[in-house]
Amino acid sequence: MAHPVQLGFQDAASPIMEELLYFHDHTLMIMFLISSLVLYIISLMLTTKLTHTSTMDAQEVETVWTILPAAILILIALPSLRILYMMDEITSPSLTLKTMGHQWYWSYEYTDYENLCFDSYMTPCSDLKPGELRLLEVDNRVVLPTELSIRTLISSEDVLHSWTVPSLGVKTDAIPGRLNQATLMASRPGVYYGQCSEICGANHSFMPIVLELIPLKHFEEWLLFTL
């Protein structure tokens, strides 16, 4: 989860989020090198008295500044496309979770089981227990197993919403009349928080998402207790 005055990403808890962090560092390093080169050239131009006013063209320089940016863009595009296809690929999911956005709460349905569905509202500040987080706790958490591929089907009953859990690298728009899908797989147990990330009205800030990821054995016990 996020912390006050946090500047970086949340700790990755899924393979996809780890790949996104690697890609971020990769791209940031390329940008840093380009910025350093540009600053060096600017400082060189400001400090030297040498000029070439009679130069009309320079084929070598033009070739370099055409090929070099193209190569840099390829170095950025290839890892990006790889992650894009990884996020879109859903093969043999172990569980399917249907998520519907409402003004201003979420409803969930475990489509693999009968009558396992519930609404998830934000817990009011007056009902918070010691240690619970303001504006992030809900009355019904989504319980899912770890280390299993889970497909989420996401849509909306009214306006645009966005189902987002940063630690798991998931952010999918909930669009009325359209069913989007995403895949998630947690690499370790824990409680992961998210929020609606699409402005959806007056109470947009009060649509938290809480996922409780537990080992498969405990998930089966939870199913027996719930059903």
Curated annotation (Swiss-Prot):
<keyword id="KW-0186">Copper</keyword>
<feature type="topological domain" description="Mitochondrial intermembrane">
    <location>
        <begin position="1"/>
        <end position="14"/>
    </location>
</feature>
<dbReference type="Pfam" id="PF00116">
    <property type="entry name" value="COX2"/>
</dbReference>
<keyword id="KW-1133">Transmembrane helix</keyword>
<keyword id="KW-0460">Magnesium</keyword>
<dbReference type="GO" id="GO:0004129">
    <property type="term" value="F:cytochrome-c oxidase activity"/>
</dbReference>
<comment type="subunit">
    <text>Component of the cytochrome c oxidase (complex IV, CIV), a multisubunit enzyme composed of 14 subunits. The complex is composed of a catalytic core of 3 subunits MT-CO1, MT-CO2 and MT-CO3, encoded in the mitochondrial DNA, and 11 supernumerary subunits COX4I, COX5A, COX5B, COX6A, COX6B, COX6C, COX7A, COX7B, COX7C, COX8 and NDUFA4, which are encoded in the nuclear genome.</text>
</comment>
<dbReference type="Pfam" id="PF02790">
    <property type="entry name" value="COX2_TM"/>
</dbReference>
<dbReference type="InterPro" id="IPR011759">
    <property type="entry name" value="Cyt_c_oxidase_su2_TM_dom"/>
</dbReference>
<feature type="binding site">
    <location>
        <position position="196"/>
    </location>
    <ligand>
        <name>Cu cation A2</name>
    </ligand>
</feature>
<keyword id="KW-0249">Electron transport</keyword>
<keyword id="KW-0679">Respiratory chain</keyword>
<dbReference type="InterPro" id="IPR008972">
    <property type="entry name" value="Cupredoxin"/>
</dbReference>
<dbReference type="InterPro" id="IPR002429">
    <property type="entry name" value="CcO_II-like_C"/>
</dbReference>
<feature type="binding site">
    <location>
        <position position="207"/>
    </location>
    <ligand>
        <name>Cu cation A1</name>
    </ligand>
</feature>
<dbReference type="InterPro" id="IPR014222">
    <property type="entry name" value="Cyt_c_oxidase_su2"/>
</dbReference>
<keyword id="KW-0812">Transmembrane</keyword>
<feature type="binding site">
    <location>
        <position position="198"/>
    </location>
    <ligand>
        <name>Mg(2+)</name>
    </ligand>
</feature>
<keyword id="KW-1278">Translocase</keyword>
<dbReference type="GO" id="GO:0045277">
    <property type="term" value="C:respiratory chain complex IV"/>
</dbReference>
<keyword id="KW-0472">Membrane</keyword>
<feature type="binding site">
    <location>
        <position position="204"/>
    </location>
    <ligand>
        <name>Cu cation A2</name>
    </ligand>
</feature>
<feature type="binding site">
    <location>
        <position position="161"/>
    </location>
    <ligand>
        <name>Cu cation A1</name>
    </ligand>
</feature>
<feature type="transmembrane region" description="Helical; Name=I">
    <location>
        <begin position="15"/>
        <end position="45"/>
    </location>
</feature>
<dbReference type="GO" id="GO:0005743">
    <property type="term" value="C:mitochondrial inner membrane"/>
</dbReference>
<dbReference type="InterPro" id="IPR045187">
    <property type="entry name" value="CcO_II"/>
</dbReference>
<feature type="topological domain" description="Mitochondrial matrix">
    <location>
        <begin position="46"/>
        <end position="59"/>
    </location>
</feature>
<dbReference type="InterPro" id="IPR001505">
    <property type="entry name" value="Copper_CuA"/>
</dbReference>
<feature type="binding site">
    <location>
        <position position="200"/>
    </location>
    <ligand>
        <name>Cu cation A2</name>
    </ligand>
</feature>
<protein>
    <recommendedName>
        <fullName>Cytochrome c oxidase subunit 2</fullName>
        <ecNumber>7.1.1.9</ecNumber>
    </recommendedName>
</protein>
<comment type="function">
    <text>Component of the cytochrome c oxidase, the last enzyme in the mitochondrial electron transport chain which drives oxidative phosphorylation. The respiratory chain contains 3 multisubunit complexes succinate dehydrogenase (complex II, CII), ubiquinol-cytochrome c oxidoreductase (cytochrome b-c1 complex, complex III, CIII) and cytochrome c oxidase (complex IV, CIV), that cooperate to transfer electrons derived from NADH and succinate to molecular oxygen, creating an electrochemical gradient over the inner membrane that drives transmembrane transport and the ATP synthase.</text>
</comment>
<feature type="transmembrane region" description="Helical; Name=II">
    <location>
        <begin position="60"/>
        <end position="87"/>
    </location>
</feature>
<dbReference type="InterPro" id="IPR034210">
    <property type="entry name" value="CcO_II_C"/>
</dbReference>
<keyword id="KW-0813">Transport</keyword>
<feature type="topological domain" description="Mitochondrial intermembrane">
    <location>
        <begin position="88"/>
        <end position="227"/>
    </location>
</feature>
<feature type="binding site">
    <location>
        <position position="200"/>
    </location>
    <ligand>
        <name>Cu cation A1</name>
    </ligand>
</feature>
<keyword id="KW-0479">Metal-binding</keyword>
<feature type="binding site">
    <location>
        <position position="196"/>
    </location>
    <ligand>
        <name>Cu cation A1</name>
    </ligand>
</feature>
<keyword id="KW-0999">Mitochondrion inner membrane</keyword>
<comment type="similarity">
    <text>Belongs to the cytochrome c oxidase subunit 2 family.</text>
</comment>
<feature type="binding site">
    <location>
        <position position="198"/>
    </location>
    <ligand>
        <name>Cu cation A2</name>
    </ligand>
</feature>
<dbReference type="GO" id="GO:0005507">
    <property type="term" value="F:copper ion binding"/>
</dbReference>
